[in-house]
Amino acid sequence: MTTTPTAMPVSPSHDVIIAAAQRAARAIPPLWPLASSVAVNPFLGQGSEPLEMAGARLRRASGIAITMPRSWYAERLQSGQIAEQDLQAALQNAPAALRPPNLPALKQAVQAARPAPQALPTVAELARDADAVDWPGIVNERIGHWAAGYFDQGQALWAVGQSGGAYSTWRIIATHDLTPEIAGLAGFARYVAEAPANAEDAIVDCVARLGLSQDALDGYFHRLLTTLGGWGQLARYRLWQAELSGATDACVTDLLAVRLLWEAALLGNGGCTLVPGWQRAVAAYAEPVAATSDDVIDSILQEAAERAAQRKLSAVLAAPSPAQVASGRVKLQMAFCIDVRSEVFRRALESLDSGIQTLGFAGFFGLGIGHRRFASDVVEARLPVLLTPGVTTCAGDATSSAAASDLSARIAARAKRAWGRFKLAAISSFAFVEATGPIYVAKLLRDGLALARPHAPDEPAPRPADGLDLETRLTMATRILKAMSFTGGFARLVVLAGHGAKVVNNPHASALHCGACGGYSGEVNARLLASLLNDSQVRAGLAARGIVIPADTLFLAALHDTTTDAVTLYTADHPSPGHAEDLAQARQWLGAAGALARGERAVRLPRAHRSQDIAHRARDWAEIRPEWALAGCQAFIAAPRSRTAGRDLAGRAFLHDYDWRYDDGFGVLELILTAPVVVASWISLQYYGSTVAPESLGAGNKLLHNVTGGIGVVEGNGGILRTGLPWQSVHDGQRLTHEPLRLSVLIEAPPEAIATILERHPQVRALFDNRWLHLFALDDEGRMAHRYAGDLRWEQNASGARSCDHSVPMLA
């Protein structure tokens, strides 16, 4: 094979090239494996720039638009969902240089189709056009074939070794793979064998062969990493995890080297035919990214849609609250995750009795734990992915009987794994079906007819693995209760409800669990906190610190199944005969609230004509939409529950209890802005990205998914790893069920206090300054009084004035 480097005046230095490679690695988001998948902001690398600039950058890098088609906005204008005042306000807020001169010009632009987004070409794409061979497809297929084995987490019986790193492992495979040469890339195996043994040296060598200028590096490297889809993002996940522990990981750089070797080989194979087109492409990569007038128009229309939704939300919050305030002691208090799915259940539960109070807090309940399940050595990080575990916990007591049960469970698990490998092994799999098929008839019927009833996790109660001294336990309890704004007025029964989802035949099941628990269900954290707050020594210490929990108050953990709205109480953790009547009443209320919530959800779910259909759907192998998860999420509200109680927020708002009057120094407010708000933004923007650009930022069609390596899904039998949400998670087959809107964050706190915190956290501030999130300060009556205008400035919110229209029933 010969290589034909393009003309280049000055070759960038090694350090300059590697620095550009590292920047490109941070321009793509990480992808968590299926076992603990969490929502990730697909625009994580573009948070420092506004929507129009990110749109211009991703158009070049991925060939996608990151707003809806103009027709989507035109329909909303015509129907009145977007009012002229929304359009005018968004226009005035846009960059003056490129925005339409006036409202009529903007309305005219809405009717015109925007130019189709076009990515800058790679060498593989130029070679495809020249040779009529699908080189991009071949590159993706061969890299995907290797990567599925390299990143495998136990699915493959014969795993690819990982010694030496991704680049070295790929070279071993590629030097024996004749597929590229059969397709027409002569001498590719020899070319790879002769390439530098070190990934960084290979990158530098390829840059020289490709004739890349320094200015072209960032854009071109970013472009190549986007062509890798989820494989590049999985490598970015490894870097993310390494950096959390103060280390680093070269996997992204290794994959970039692999992709560059393909590019250099294809350019050399194409000879002079590809050089003119490639030189034009290099020049285009070297041009600075600049937003066009179309990018600005699209960003204006997107903001207008968001202002329309904010106007309706403002009317809901300004209307008189229908909630009744009970006199005397509260009968039941129940703390839920802030997840939007909890809003429906909380509203249903509170409607049953004025003596019921619910609270909202991040579902990990302030306990950053690494947890080992019963009979397992795998440590599960049950906390937001932005954090690292501070405490290790395990299931079961440290007793001889527990140890015997642990050993028995481990032996059974190993036998099950051995049987599973026997079923799939190269030789035994052929005889397996004929020999043992009849044994599985009953199971096939039970599963195929959705007769099996899944149960909530019921492991032994969790405990700290190494024990915690009293001062540590007391500090944790104090911090958590203050963060929950829950320091008084305790009921006799306080339920701490984590949440999870019981579904079948769903590779993305963990994405339905609690994002604040790292993609796991939340019962472990809830059970740990209940034990902590029932500790008599902790209660005595809390009383000395001014938090008095009555002696008759019992804390219990629960698990809210968001698919069926069933609630499991972990009463065995803390038996209390004196609370038998309280528990009986609570069970009755929870059953009734579940029925109300299922009835509300059934209206939105396809083929769920009755609330009774919900449970059957959760057990149905063929059900591709067991629940809508967080589709429709629109707002994050941190305020006292009295501001939202009784108001129909339609399961579209994250609800976090917060009272700034009891937050000395605004430490709790700082925690909310830097943790739950950021996690909610990741969720919101993943839904946004999977809706506006499903072909690139979404996971594709569930019906075509195949799990690969136990880490992710591909469509069909190979290729790139898909990321984001499946199309069925945002679309019901006829229309979108998720309205792509950037999250509106509403906080009841003094605007100057919020601004002070933003000033201390530049990365969080950038999300608001560049309007990836909208920010409002609520006044003392819960109205959206102040809008954040960027650069630590606030303005009066026109729609936050006292509303005269009290007829708005819900967010729509």
Swiss-Prot record:
Could you tell me which InterPro entries the record lists for this protein?
A: DabA
Q: Which residues of this UniProt protein bind Zn(2+)?
A: C337, D339, H499, C514
GO MF annotations, alphabetized = zinc ion binding
Q: How does it sit in the membrane?
A: Peripheral membrane protein
Q: Mind telling me which Pfam families this protein's record contains? A: DabA
The cofactors it requires, by name, are: Zn(2+)
Q: Where in the cell is it found?
A: Cell inner membrane
Provide the assembly information. Answer: Forms a complex with DabB.
Which cysteine residues pair off into disulfide bonds?
Answer: none
| Cross-referenced PANTHER family | INORGANIC CARBON TRANSPORTER SUBUNIT DABA-RELATED (PTHR38344:SF1), UPF0753 PROTEIN AQ_863 (PTHR38344)
Write out the function statement from the record.
Answer: Part of an energy-coupled inorganic carbon pump.
Query: Any signal peptide, and if so, which residues?
Result: none
| Protein's name according to its UniProt entry | Probable inorganic carbon transporter subunit DabA
* Keyword annotations of the record: Cell inner membrane, Cell membrane, Membrane, Metal-binding, Transport, Zinc
**The organism's place on the tree of life at top rank:** Bacteria
Q: Which family does it belong to?
A: Belongs to the inorganic carbon transporter (TC 9.A.2) DabA family.
Cellular compartments per GO CC? plasma membrane
Decide whether keyword Ion transport is in the record.
no
